[in-house]
């Protein structure tokens, strides 16, 4: 198992190097856009000579049509669906929540890695893979640190230009977001599946290395196939680069996400049902409290990602409507007989978009609540080198000399009480002090399954 963990870390290390090289590779430099003020492009439209339209569209410009003819004006970046102030609020929220989610994933990754964790169980690699996926996905937000939509640090390469696959930064961040999301969701689902099968005694053999290989291959396929058709780009309602086509988004992300979410939720509810049956038979109602948190976590996470899915579906269904009002807006601006003030901005719901972008960044926080706040994590850190070295020993010794012996004694007794029977089946059938979270983190790979007759 240690050998597998070492190979896993080596693979992750080289993957990071590859992604970094993609982000920094010297792709053909984009021609410097020529942006001029022009009375022809009124309102927030941006002037761009239409003579080289085909090449300009490849690098992110969208030219306006008027009376069936392409004009030397392009759609502004960011899009007029939201005001600049609203765009900046979206960006700042994504930076804050993305950073929090990244730190949550990083904490889990470090906690369950050999850096801290001296022991391992059948779910250690799965938690590490899920945490690594979260960290990668949230890196796409952290790449936007210091950026905004109002000055030379704008995410848009130039006024009226959207990021496309031809931009190395766009390609790198899109790959990181897609791979991290798919890899994280797959491992979250397999963790719940394996835990339920193990508890029921259907699967007792450890298949973690096969799970890792399968999820890694699927994530690679779902990430790199879209590159063939240059699918990574910045949309009218996005803060960065991701799959540009609605068809690709549906096939390579949303369908998979929905399946993972439904399957994982079903398995975790079934696990909670098994625990409830055991608790009911043993007449220990107090142990139900230990499972309120995972149930709440599942409820909130399910709401978040189902909201994302249905919001996405609504955008796809209403795509023709948004395209029509955008065309009406640009036609109004191009019509010399109309005043600019008469042109109605094509607005979308700020609240719906804000919640959508927020939900995207809840995966790391949900994983932290589920796998990062439990007795086993506390035990891992207390047994690690970081709490068992000469420096910490001297610090604890000095604290004891200041009169904290009673406190330390109490903590020691509490710690002993919690973990004396950690490897015993009685901790499940009699004490029932462990919740679903602690069961998934328990280090005994060979405990007997709980079978309700």
Curated annotation (Swiss-Prot):
The chain crosses the membrane at residues 90-110, 125-145, 171-191, 210-230, 251-271, 297-317, 353-373. Residues 111-124, 192-209, 272-296, 374-453 are cytoplasmic. Its main location: membrane. Keywords: Glycoprotein, Membrane, Receptor, Signal, Transmembrane, Transmembrane helix. GO terms for cellular component: membrane. Residues 1-24 form the signal peptide. InterPro entries: GPCR_Fz/Smo-like. PANTHER family: FRIZZLED_SMOOTHENED-LIKE SANS CRD PROTEIN F-RELATED (PTHR31787:SF7), G-PROTEIN-COUPLED RECEPTOR GPCR FAMILY PROTEIN (PTHR31787). Gene3D superfamilies: Rhodopsin 7-helix transmembrane proteins. This is Frizzled/smoothened-like sans CRD protein G. Residues 25-89, 146-170, 231-250, 318-352 are extracellular. Glycans are attached at residues 49, 67, 148. It is a multi-pass membrane protein. It is found in: Membrane. Belongs to the G-protein coupled receptor Fz/Smo family. The lineage of its organism: Eukaryota, Amoebozoa, Evosea, Eumycetozoa, Dictyostelia.
């Amino acid at each position: 198992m240690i050998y597998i963990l070492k190979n896993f870390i080596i693979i992750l290390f080289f993957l990071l190097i590859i992604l970094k090289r993609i982000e920094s590779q010297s792709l053909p430099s984009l021609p410097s856009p020529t942006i001029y003020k022009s009375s022809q492009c009124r309102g927030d439209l941006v002037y761009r000579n239409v003579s080289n339209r085909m090449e300009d569209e490849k690098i992110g410009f969208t030219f306006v049509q008027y009376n069936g003819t392409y004009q030397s004006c392009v759609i502004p970046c960011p899009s007029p669906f939201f005001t600049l102030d609203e765009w900046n609020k979206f960006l700042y929220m994504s930076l804050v929540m993305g950073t929090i989610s990244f730190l949550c994933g990083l904490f889990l990754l470090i906690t369950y890695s050999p850096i801290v964790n001296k022991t391992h169980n059948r779910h250690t690699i799965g938690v590490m893979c899920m945490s690594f996926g979260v960290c990668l996905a949230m890196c796409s937000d952290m790449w936007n640190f210091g950026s905004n939509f109002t000055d030379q640090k704008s995410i848009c390469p130039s006024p009226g230009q959207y990021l496309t696959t031809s931009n190395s930064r766009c390609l790198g961040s899109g790959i990181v977001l897609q791979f991290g999301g798919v890899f994280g969701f797959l491992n979250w689902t397999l963790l719940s599946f394996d835990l339920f099968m193990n508890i029921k005694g259907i699967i007792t053999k450890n298949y973690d290395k096969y799970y890792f290989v399968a999820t890694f291959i699927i994530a690679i396929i779902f990430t790199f196939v879209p590159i063939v058709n240059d699918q990574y780009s910045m949309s009218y309602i996005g803060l960065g680069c991701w799959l540009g086509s609605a068809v690709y988004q549906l096939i390579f992300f949303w369908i998979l996400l929905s399946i993972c979410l439904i399957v994982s939720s079903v398995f975790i509810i079934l696990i909670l049902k098994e625990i409830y049956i055991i608790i009911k038979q043993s007449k220990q109602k107090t142990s139900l409290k230990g499972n309120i948190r995972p149930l709440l976590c599942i409820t909130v996470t399910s709401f978040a990602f189902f909201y994302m899915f249905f919001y996405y579906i609504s955008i796809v269904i209403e795509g023709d409507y948004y395209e029509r009002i955008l065309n009406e807006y640009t036609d109004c601006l191009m019509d010399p007989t109309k005043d600019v003030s008469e042109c109605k901005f094509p607005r979308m719901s700020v609240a719906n978009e804000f919640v959508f972008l927020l939900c995207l960044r809840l995966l790391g926080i949900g994983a932290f609540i589920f796998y990062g706040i439990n007795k086993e994590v506390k035990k891992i850190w207390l047994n690690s080198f970081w709490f068992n070295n000469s420096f910490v020993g001297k610090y604890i010794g000095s604290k004891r000399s200041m009169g904290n012996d009673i406190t330390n004694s109490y903590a020691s007794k509490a710690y002993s009480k919690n973990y004396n029977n950690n490897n015993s089946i009685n901790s499940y059938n009699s004490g029932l002090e462990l919740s679903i979270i602690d069961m998934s983190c328990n280090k005994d790979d060979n405990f007997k399954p709980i079978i309700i007759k």
